[in-house]
Amino acid sequence: MSLNITENESISTAVIDAINSGATLKDINAIPDDMMDDIYSYAYDFYNKGRIEEAEVFFRFLCIYDFYNVDYIMGLAAIYQIKEQFQQAADLYAVAFALGKNDYTPVFHTGQCQLRLKAPLKAKECFELVIQHSNDEKLKIKAQSYLD
């Protein structure tokens, strides 16, 4: 089946409109939430088993198809952190924080990455933000341990 130019333009316009209105590829392709949850389970399982390369493939897919899901972004960021790709991890943690609003876990992990990037002042700022603003007492204690 071949599409003519008008059909191609119509499809392109529909996809662009959907993306501009906040739709994800998951939405555009009508991928069910339970399928995304299953894929996340595989990614998480691979991560926990230390099969980082396989986990990365799944987390990348998840992020591409639903870039608003903080869990997917955190998963890929954690992969990058394990692979010592600290700048990429920190960048993704920043996105996760922006999407997650009041969860300071990504800020904590950004601080860890900044230490490995030899940016102790940036790391200190991250840990201080966690201590000042997080509601998670365990996370605050972890952050404080980096400052002591």
Language-model segments: residues:
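Long, contiguous interaction/recruitment modules in multidomain scaffold/adaptor proteins
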Residues: 1-35
